[in-house]
Regions:
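Short loop/turn segments immediately following beta-strands, especially the blade-tip
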Residues: 92, 150, 258-266, 342-349
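Blade-level signature of beta-propeller repeat domains, shared across WD40, Kelch, NHL, RCC1
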Residues: 321-360
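A short loop-to-beta-strand structural motif that recurs across blades of beta-propeller domains
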Residues: 87-90, 142-145, 202-205, 255-257, ...
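Surface-exposed loop and turn segments in beta-propeller and other repeat-based domains
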Residues: 16, 27-54, 100-109, 154-167, ...
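Flexible "stalk/tail and boundary" regions
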Residues: 94-95, 206-210, 301-314, 321-329, ...
Length: 360
């Protein structure tokens, strides 16, 4: 597959420019690699190829994307359907892309997640567990839940802020040095009708699984969503998907904010990093070269460390998240699963999760 070059000067002067591109003027979702600046081809690699893996009659590919070494699979959360049908975990084999579904005990409405080293785990090995943001429902608190997919066991790590009920925990990352869990709390369970009305602000938190300390590290969001550390761990990126609540409102945030990480514990110097031109930036990951990738309204957008849009993995529909694997990135757009292969870029956590590419 060749890259499609976007003429930024033509786009600057003609708001209908995209309608002239065959790659974007489509009636059904299809994948293309849109290069906004020549650097994008170097990020993905000149030999990168893209294709659709599968198209299912239900929204199996929504959030998460956590690697489990024992079965060489990614664990992806499905989209919410009803209170009678808990959110499923979709298991994608990286051997042949076969798809299965499972559920874990005491995990009710899973959303974002990450690989997890519990206290005392051997960090010279790949992470033995996964941790999910459980949005909860009317009968269960929203929680951070640790899961061992190999033994089908789970443990609630945190289900309140010092006794106050969270709204709908959305996404989480583990700091690779301290082991702390950094996570966001949004209102989407309430907007989707399976959580009570929120009772506290929408914020970013830091939790120490070793001590039980939980701390608010950032507020002032409409809907804090995805979060990710830069490769050097000096910056935390947080997406605000406030443009989407009961419906889409383009005058509200569809924004990525950047913060300085201070002493691995707190945040400072909040600033606007990027704004999504289509939809809103949801799940977010960094690569080892400092580029910032986010799922958005028409696929995955890629910015350099200065916030310049380099290009898009365009699929023509909303993507909520994606996952890096060695030499590839899998893109989740609810009922459809896409892949870019022969990928040059390496995700920040690929070395930790897969034990591959650690020499970079």
């Amino acid at each position: 597959m060749s890259f499609v070059s976007v003429d930024l000067l033509a786009l600057a002067r003609d708001a209908t420019y995209f309608n002239t591109l065959s790659a974007t003027n489509i009636t059904t979702p299809a994948i293309s690699l849109l290069s906004y600046v020549p650097e994008f081809q170097n990020v993905l690699g000149e030999n990168a190829t893209a294709r659709k893996i599968t198209d299912l009659p239900w929204e199996a590919f929504h959030e998460g994307g956590i690697y489990n070494k024992n079965d060489n699979s990614l664990y992806v959360t499905s989209n919410y359907q009803s209170l009678e049908d808990n959110i499923n975990i979709t298991v994608i084999s990286l051997d042949d892309y076969t798809i299965t579904s499972t559920q874990f005990p005491d995990l009710w409405e899973a959303n974002g997640g990450t690989s997890y080293y519990p206290p005392g785990a051997d960090q010279s090995q790949t992470p033995p567990q996964q941790v999910y943001c459980d949005e909860g429902d009317f009968e269960h608190y929203s929680s951070l839940v640790a899961v061992d997919p190999n033994t089908n066991t789970s443990t609630v790590l945190l289900n309140s802020f010092l006794g106050r009920n969270f709204s709908s925990l959305n996404d989480v990352r583990q700091h690779p040095v301290t082991g702390d869990l950094w996570f966001t709390d949004a209102d989407y369970g309430y907007y989707q009708g399976f959580r009570p009305q929120p009772s506290q602000p929408k914020q970013v938190y830091r939790f120490e699984p070793f001590t039980g300390i939980v701390q608010v590290v950032a507020d002032g969001f409409v809907e804090p969503n995805g979060l990710e550390f830069s490769a050097d761990l000096k910056t935390l990126y947080v997406t605000d998907t406030g443009a989407q609540e009961f419906g889409f409102n383009g005058t509200r945030p569809a924004t990525i904010y950047a913060f300085d990480v201070i002493c691995e514990k707190t945040l400072a110097s909040r600033r606007t990093f990027a704004f999504s031109d289509i939809g809103f930036p949801d799940g977010i990951h960094c690569d080892t070269e400092g580029n910032v990738w986010a799922a958005a309204g028409d696929g995955v957008h890629v910015w350099n460390h200065e916030g310049v849009l380099l290009g898009k993995i365009f699929v023509g529909e909303t993507s909520n998240n994606f996952a890096f694997a060695p030499g590839k990135v899998l893109v989740f757009s609810n009922s459809r699963l896409w892949v870019v292969e022969n990928l040059k870029a390496q995700g920040r956590e690929v070395c930790k999760d897969f034990g591959i590419g650690c020499e970079k």
